């Protein structure tokens, strides 16, 4: 299966859980956060659940053992994922669901890519300038020397590119267009 097919599949399942959650979105969100933390702490449990040779019945037993922390709707949803042999995608689906829930609550995470590590004051200026979008719940600073200077901010599916590299790339493109114009008119 291609990466875009995986992404579409993950998004489809996440959207279904989001819509099924309805008025219980906050509760389901907390349960999903608990489950993701559990799988992070107990990695071997997720490896077991995502293994294709483990039967549906065994996977169901494991999920029912942690059922006291999860609502019936979430357990049923996870059982559908297992029944459809998509258990290896469970974490991605749950993370995508959280992304949809945050978007619904007007919360988002941002990643700031810069040529060198930004100072807290610089990060604060950037986050304050983006506060009109909603509540920023997490900021990460990724260092990428290839952007030469400035920064690139990614939030959700959006990108703000204020890097020196992109500026120079645009300048090169404009120069090429001008050269072509001159050649065509001379």
Curated annotation (Swiss-Prot):
Any matching Pfam family: OSCP
Record-annotated membrane-spanning stretches: none
NADP listed as a keyword: no
Main location: membrane
Keyword field: ATP synthesis, Cell inner membrane, Cell membrane, CF(1), Hydrogen ion transport, Ion transport, Membrane, Transport
Example GO molecular function: proton-transporting ATP synthase activity, rotational mechanism
KW Nucleotide-binding (keyword) present: no
Subcellular location: Cell inner membrane
Membrane topology: Peripheral membrane protein
Gene Ontology CC annotations of this record: plasma membrane; proton-transporting ATP synthase complex
Role summary: F(1)F(0) ATP synthase produces ATP from ADP in the presence of a proton or sodium gradient. F-type ATPases consist of two structural domains, F(1) containing the extramembraneous catalytic core and F(0) containing the membrane proton channel, linked together by a central stalk and a peripheral stalk. During catalysis, ATP synthesis in the catalytic domain of F(1) is coupled via a rotary mechanism of the central stalk subunits to proton translocation. This protein is part of the stalk that links CF(0) to CF(1). It either transmits conformational changes from CF(0) to CF(1) or is implicated in proton conduction.
Family of this protein: Belongs to the ATPase delta chain family.
PANTHER family: ATP SYNTHASE DELTA CHAIN
Complex formation: F-type ATPases have 2 components, F(1) - the catalytic core - and F(0) - the membrane proton channel. F(1) has five subunits: alpha(3), beta(3), gamma(1), delta(1), epsilon(1). F(0) has three main subunits: a(1), b(2) and c(10-14). The alpha and beta chains form an alternating ring which encloses part of the gamma chain. F(1) is attached to F(0) by a central stalk formed by the gamma and epsilon chains, while a peripheral stalk is formed by the delta and b chains.
Protein's recorded name: ATP synthase subunit delta
Organism: Wolbachia sp. subsp. Drosophila simulans (strain wRi)
Gene: atpH
């Amino acid at each position: 299966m291609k990466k875009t097919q995986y992404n579409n599949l993950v998004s489809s399942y996440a959207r279904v859980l989001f819509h099924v959650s309805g008025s219980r979105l906050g509760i389901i969100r907390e349960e999903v956060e608990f489950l993701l933390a559990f799988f992070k702490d107990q990695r071997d449990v997720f490896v077991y659940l995502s293994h294709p040779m483990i039967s549906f019945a065994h996977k169901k037993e494991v999920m029912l053992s942690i059922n006291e922390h999860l609502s019936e709707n979430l357990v049923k949803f996870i059982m559908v994922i297992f029944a459809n042999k998509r258990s290896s995608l469970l974490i991605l689906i749950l993370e995508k669901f959280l992304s949809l829930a945050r978007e619904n609550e007007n919360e988002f995470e941002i990643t700031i890519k810069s040529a060198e590590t930004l100072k807290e004051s610089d990060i604060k200026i950037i986050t304050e300038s983006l506060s009109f979008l909603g509540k920023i719940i997490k900021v990460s600073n990724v260092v990428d020397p290839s952007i030469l200077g400035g920064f690139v901010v990614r939030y959700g599916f959006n990108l703000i590119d204020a890097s020196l590299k992109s500026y120079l790339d645009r300048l090169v493109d404009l120069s090429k267009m001008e050269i072509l114009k001159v050649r065509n008119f001379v």
